[in-house]
Amino acid sequence: MLLKDKIIAVIYGGRSAEREVSLESGERVTQALINKGYKVEAIDLFGPGGRLNPVKQLSDAHFDFAFIALHGGEGEDGRVQAVLDMLQKPYTGSRPLASGFAMDKALTKKYWQGLGIPTPNYLCFSDKPDLEKIHREMSFPLIIKPSREGSTIGISKVHTQAELTKALEDAKKYDSDILVEEFVSGPEFTVTIIDDVAYAPIGLKPSSEHELYDYEAKYIAEDTQYLLPCGLSDDLELEVQALALEAYRSLNCSGWGRVDIMQGSDGCFTVLEVNTSPGMTSHSLVPMAANYAGIDYDSLVEMIAEQAWHSFLETC
């Protein structure tokens, strides 16, 4: 069975804080599939046709396979994936449990610590943050972030008590669980994984106006530097790729994803998070890594879709 004989639903939009990013990802993925000769049905989840009942929106749509271009919320935490499983519609990316696991940063960090996969020390608070515990166990600067949000939305770097209080309040707007993480002083890298193959790491260097590679540095700023090659030696590049694969596989992720990694002042690498539904916008990192490997955007989208389709056929 050829995927080109089927109808592909590109599911995008959603209602998370990353909706605007997803809208661009979905539009670009849709056009890429059309350019490659596929039959496409674009579905803006929670858009005009699905605000009241997105499950019905999906069940009423006529398609055979889904390319998930949702970011954050139910589009990345396993809920949409579970609905598609119940509808018996194959799709790109990780299964429901892996998606939900990876979306919860606190849960993955606790798991990685048990496995011996290096990740920055942290505290997680579900209710009111314990400021005394934070001061007792950690020292400034700190990173404050929602535990289950993407695109670095709600993230802050804090140096003082006043900044900490405000950052905790800001992060609470996006999630009930808040992560307080030690700041790793050093360069940041991201590794794209497609079909269990790690691509060349990209070095991320925000401008001097941005302390972090945050939402603005990702999607708005024009002066963020993306380093390819990333500036590491060949041996260290291989080390970063191996660590990314170890973190990705530990969560039982599949299809494609992206792993964010920091290098500390001691030269050691630590894993920040795994993204199971990365951005596919004009500023996004997965297309950048693929392009460096000689894969253009349209071919990248086709590769992700075909890999997922063939994996589905192997299980039939």
Where would I find each of the regions flagged by the language model?
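ATP-dependent carboxylate activation and anion-phosphoryl transfer catalytic cores
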Residues: 3-6, 233-316
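Phosphate-binding site of ATP-dependent enzymes
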Residues: 159-242, 263-270
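Active-site nucleotide/adenylate-binding loops and adjacent lid/helix of ATP-dependent enzymes
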Residues: 1-11, 58, 101-187
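Alpha-helix C-terminal capping segments
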Residues: 82-90, 115, 194, 292-293
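Hydrophobic beta-strand scaffold residues
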Residues: 40, 90-91, 119, 142, ...
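Short, flexible, mixed-charge acidic loops at enzyme active sites
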Residues: 80-85, 212-220, 276
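ATP-binding N-terminal substructure of ATP-dependent carboxylate-amine bond-forming enzymes
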Residues: 1-97, 101-103, 107, 126-133, ...
